[in-house]
């Protein structure tokens, strides 16, 4: 399971002209689900995403996680993160989970974030989405479990 996380000052996702999720300061999480992923990996990745210390403390040091910084999370499904790009000029998506399995694990990941009392907004799984963000820093990390 893969999360591309970006520290943002604001982010939103729109589907068919409707804003489905919007946050101020926090994390934009682009989530990719691979074939061998399961709930245990989703739990571990959620723990890492919410615990990752990439927000500045009073001394300007990256020492706070999103909850400590008072931020929110916007989770957007992105199957392209599971692409195999090592060969050729066209990505292969053979490493990605089936749509049904990926949606179940995406929903599970979102629910785990919410269970941590995290303000968690979302896109719409498998929809054609427009994502807007202001990357703060820029600060972007690839987390994989």
Swiss-Prot record:
Residue ranges the record marks as coiled coil: none
PANTHER family: D-AMINOACYL-TRNA DEACYLASE 1, D-TYROSYL-TRNA TYR DEACYLASE
UniProt similarity note: Belongs to the DTD family.
Effect of residue 137 to A: Loss of deacylation of D-tyrosyl-tRNA(Tyr)
Enzyme Commission code: 3.1.1.96
Protein name: D-aminoacyl-tRNA deacylase
Pfam family, one: Tyr_Deacylase
Keyword Ribonucleoprotein: no
InterPro entries: Daa-tRNA_deacyls_DTD, DTD-like_sf
Entry superkingdom: Bacteria
Catalytic activity: glycyl-tRNA(Ala) + H2O = tRNA(Ala) + glycine + H(+); a D-aminoacyl-tRNA + H2O = a tRNA + a D-alpha-amino acid + H(+); D-tyrosyl-tRNA(Tyr) + H2O = D-tyrosine + tRNA(Tyr)
Motif (Gly-cisPro motif, important for rejection of L-amino acids): 137-138
Written domain comment of the UniProt record: A Gly-cisPro motif from one monomer fits into the active site of the other monomer to allow specific chiral rejection of L-amino acids.
Species the sequence originates in: Escherichia coli (strain K12)
């Amino acid at each position: 399971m893969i999360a591309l996380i970006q520290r943002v000052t604001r982010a939103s996702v729109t589907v068919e002209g409707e804003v489905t999720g919007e946050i101020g300061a926090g994390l934009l999480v682009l989530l990719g689900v691979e074939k061998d992923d399961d709930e245990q990996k989703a739990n571990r990745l959620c723990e890492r995403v919410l615990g990752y210390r990439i927000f500045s403390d009073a001394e300007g040091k990256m020492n706070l996680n999103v909850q400590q910084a008072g931020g929110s999370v916007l989770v957007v499904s992105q199957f392209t993160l599971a692409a195999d790009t090592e060969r050729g000029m066209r990505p292969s998506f053979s490493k990605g989970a089936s749509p049904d399995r990926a949606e179940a694990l995406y929903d599970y990941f979102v629910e785990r974030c919410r269970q941590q009392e995290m303000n968690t907004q979302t896109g719409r799984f498998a929809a054609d989405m427009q994502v807007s963000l202001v990357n703060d820093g820029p600060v972007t990390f690839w987390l994989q479990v």
